[in-house]
């Protein structure tokens, strides 16, 4: 259904248009996209005639600031925070609306000799400010189009236009598939672009390390920072190992209530203690402590979820009622940390099959699943049963 990101990058590099589709949980829309430096009047006319949506120009903020093109509003209340700026026309145009004159404005916006006085405001080109970090920060067409131009080695700007149906409604995936087929355009998804970038780019940096004596023995605490959200993650490392040696690993998501306060609503604290004890007994291994509180929803939202559970929802229902998926965690950052530590094969301490799939999806090999099942208690039996029945956790005692 979707072309590979490699194929799409090649088309962008060659000056061809593609269709980029976002997630069905977001807008579920498709935009025709072309690199700005490849966008001539023919491409603009195609968008106006066949795509029929609003023709916009994603571009990096640095260039917008150089040209003194400011945001359209000071307080953005758009549902998806689409970062429109004041519209512009190149001063060398007349009305600015024709395909030829819009193409001229696009070219002027990326021309290094252009200066702020070369543009009239308002105009007929709608610049969109790119959020640095791209689709890894915001999964929108603005970021997706710029990421593709950068991956193609072109100037970080694009021209995009939403695809509308003949009846004026927005084209969804079935119609977008037909549109792409009819016009011989490759179709790509932002989800695939996110996955591509996560696989190809290093998204964590090692900050420092220090000795950490614990009640379970001596570890080395290695601190990492994610380049996606600036969160810090900690790996507790014990011993040394050969490159191909399967290492005992626990990827543990932060749980303040369980790990620190000893909450009996979950089994997280006991799992943390058990994992550290097992690694210490083994003499080598890694405990990776990820800042993914509440399966990724954060501490305050987790307490809100607890309140909903007090009122009868289970842990999955509570997340959904708050507007979150059952599990927001992504294992790409954790996988990159493990690779940086020299882990290639692991004996993974987990009850969660999704965690195994998530880590293996980034090239790590899980040679064995080591169960880390704690005795359930009256306060957490329902929670654990929900994880087994609705999330597929492997819990033999329930």
From Swiss-Prot:
**What is the protein's name according to its record?**
Riboflavin biosynthesis protein RibBA
Cofactors (names)? Mg(2+); Mn(2+); Zn(2+)
A GO cellular-component term linked to this record: cytosol
Q: Where does GTP bind?
A: 250-254, 271, 293-295, 315, 350, 355
Its annotated pathway reads: Cofactor biosynthesis; riboflavin biosynthesis; 2-hydroxy-3-oxobutyl phosphate from D-ribulose 5-phosphate: step 1/1; Cofactor biosynthesis; riboflavin biosynthesis; 5-amino-6-(D-ribitylamino)uracil from GTP: step 1/4
Which BP terms does GO give this entry? Answer: riboflavin biosynthetic process
The residues that hold D-ribulose 5-phosphate are 26-27, 31, 138-142, 162
The organism named in the record is Syntrophomonas wolfei subsp. wolfei (strain DSM 2245B / Goettingen)
Q: Where is this site: Essential for DHBP synthase activity?
A: 124, 162
Q: Which reaction does it catalyse?
A: D-ribulose 5-phosphate = (2S)-2-hydroxy-3-oxobutyl phosphate + formate + H(+); GTP + 4 H2O = 2,5-diamino-6-hydroxy-4-(5-phosphoribosylamino)-pyrimidine + formate + 2 phosphate + 3 H(+)
Q: Where is this region: DHBP synthase?
A: 1-199
The coiled-coil segments of this chain are none
SUPFAM superfamilies (UniProt xref):
RibA-like, YrdC/RibB
Keywords from the UniProt entry? GTP-binding, Hydrolase, Lyase, Magnesium, Manganese, Metal-binding, Multifunctional enzyme, Nucleotide-binding, Riboflavin biosynthesis, Zinc
An example of a GO molecular function for this protein is: zinc ion binding
Family statement:
In the N-terminal section; belongs to the DHBP synthase family.
The entry marks the following residues as binding Mg(2+) 2, namely 27, 141
- Which residues make up the binding site for Mg(2+) 1? 27
Which residue ranges does the record annotate as region GTP cyclohydrolase II? 200-398
Cofactor note text: Binds 2 divalent metal cations per subunit. Magnesium or manganese.
């Amino acid at each position: 259904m979707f072309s590979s990101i490699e194929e799409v990058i090649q088309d962008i590099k060659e000056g061809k248009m593609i269709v980029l589709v976002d997630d069905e949980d977001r807008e579920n829309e498709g935009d025709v996209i072309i690199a700005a430096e490849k966008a001539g009047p023919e491409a603009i006319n195609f968008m106006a005639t066949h795509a029929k949506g609003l023709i916009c120009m994603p571009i990096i903020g640095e260039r917008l600031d150089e040209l003194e093109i400011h945001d359209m509003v000071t307080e953005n209340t758009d549902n998806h925070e689409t970062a429109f700026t004041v519209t512009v026309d190149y001063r060398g145009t007349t009305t600015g609306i024709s395909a030829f004159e819009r193409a001229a404005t696009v070219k002027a916006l990326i021309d290094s000799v252009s200066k702020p006085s070369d543009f009239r405001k308002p105009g007929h080109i709608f610049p969109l400010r790119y959020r640095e970090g791209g689709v890894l920060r915001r999964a929108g067409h603005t970021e997706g189009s710029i990421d593709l131009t950068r991956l193609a080695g072109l100037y970080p700007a694009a021209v995009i236009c939403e695809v509308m149906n003949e009846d004026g409604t927005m084209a969804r995936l079935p119609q977008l598939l037909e549109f792409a087929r009819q016009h011989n355009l490759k179709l790509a998804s932002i989800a695939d672009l996110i996955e591509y970038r996560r696989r190809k780019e290093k998204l964590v940096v090692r900050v420092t390390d220090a000795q950490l004596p614990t009640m379970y023995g001596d570890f080395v605490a290695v601190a990492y920072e994610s380049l996606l959200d600036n969160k810090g993650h900690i790996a507790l490392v014990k011993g040394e190992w050969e490159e191909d040696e399967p290492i005992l690993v626990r990827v543990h998501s932060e749980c303040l209530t369980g790990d620190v306060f000893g909450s009996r609503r979950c089994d997280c604290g006991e799992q943390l203690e058990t994992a550290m004890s097992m690694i210490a007994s083994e003499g080598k291994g890694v405990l990776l402590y990820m800042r993914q509180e509440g399966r990724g929803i954060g501490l305050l939202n987790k307490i809100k979820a607890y309140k909903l559970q007090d009122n009868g929802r289970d842990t999955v229902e509570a997340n959904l009622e708050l507007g979150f998926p059952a599990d927001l965690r992504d294992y790409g950052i954790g996988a990159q940390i493990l690779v940086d530590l020299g882990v290639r094969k692991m004996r993974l301490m987990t009850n969660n099959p999704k965690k195994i799939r998530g880590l293996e999806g980034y090239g790590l090999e899980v040679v064995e699943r080591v169960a880390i099942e704690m005795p359930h208690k009256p306060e957490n039996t329902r929670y654990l049963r929900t994880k087994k029945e609705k999330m597929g956790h492997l819990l033999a005692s329930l």
